[in-house]
Regions:
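Eukaryotic, polar/proline-rich low-complexity intrinsically disordered regions
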Residues: 1-185
Length: 185
C-alpha cells in the first residue's frame, strides 16, 4: 500500500476542511486560505487520533494531484485550489496554452453546451492540460466526456486565466462558443 493510499481518508477529510468546511474541525482560514499547521494537527486528532505533522507532511508530499501546499516557513497549509469558500489565492494572470480540456460526466453535457462551463460552488472553472487528466476528472462524476476549450480565443477576447500551484488552469467561466465536445464515450 502506497503512502497516498495509506492516508486516503485523512487526505479526503483534509481536502474538505481546507477547501470547504474548516469549521468541521473548529479551525479558520485566513483570507488567502491558509490554516495554522499546529492548530490543524491538534484539531484533526479529534477525528484521526494518531494524526501528526509527519502524516500531514506525507499527505502533502505524496498527493498525486498536489492539492496542498505549505507556506515557506512550514507553519501554514492550504489547498492549492478548489475552494467553495471566498479565499484569495494571490494568483497572477497567465497566458494560457492554445487549448485546455475539461472533463465532466455525460449527464452534464446538454447543460454545458447551452450555458458553458460555470464555476458553480467553486471560485473558478478548472481546466486540465491534457485529455488524460480531464478524463480522470470526468470519471469521478460518472461516465466521462471531454470538452476542448479554445483558450487562445478566450484569452484574446479578454478572459483571464490563472495557473494554480499544482498545474490546474483556472478561469471564471467558459462560454459555449469556446467549447468543443471531443470525447463522448
Amino acid at each position: 500500500m502506497s503512502k497516498e493510499e495509506k492516508h486516503k481518508k485523512e487526505s479526503k477529510f483534509l481536502s474538505l476542511v481546507l477547501r470547504h468546511h474548516p469549521e468541521a474541525i473548529g479551525i479558520s482560514l485566513d483570507t488567502h486560505g491558509w490554516a495554522e499547521v499546529n492548530v490543524l494537527i491538534k484539531n484533526m486528532k479529534r477525528k484521526f487520533p494518531v494524526f501528526s505533522l509527519k502524516i500531514l507532511e506525507e499527505i502533502v508530499a505524496t498527493d498525486s494531484k498536489q492539492r496542498y501546499a505549505f507556506s515557506e516557513d512550514n507553519t501554514k497549509i492550504r489547498a492549492n485550489q478548489g475552494h467553495s469558500l471566498a479565499v484569495t489565492l494571490e494568483l497572477q494572470p497567465q497566458t494560457p496554452p492554445e487549448c485546455l480540456y475539461h472533463g465532466t460526466a455525460s449527464r452534464f453535457v446538454e447543460s454545458i453546451l447551452k450555458s458553458g462551463l460555470q464555476k458553480q460552488t467553486r471560485q473558478h472553472v478548472h481546466l486540465s492540460m491534457d485529455i488524460a487528466t480531464a478524463t480522470k476528472v470526468g470519471a469521478r462524476h460518472g461516465k466521462p466526456v471531454i470538452f476542448k476549450v479554445n483558450t487562445k480565443a478566450m484569452h484574446k477576447a479578454g478572459y483571464v486565466f490563472y495557473l494554480s500551484a499544482n498545474g490546474v488552469w483556472l478561469t471564471d467561466e467558459v462560454p459555449p462558443k469556446f467549447l468543443n465536445l471531443i470525447v463522448n464515450n
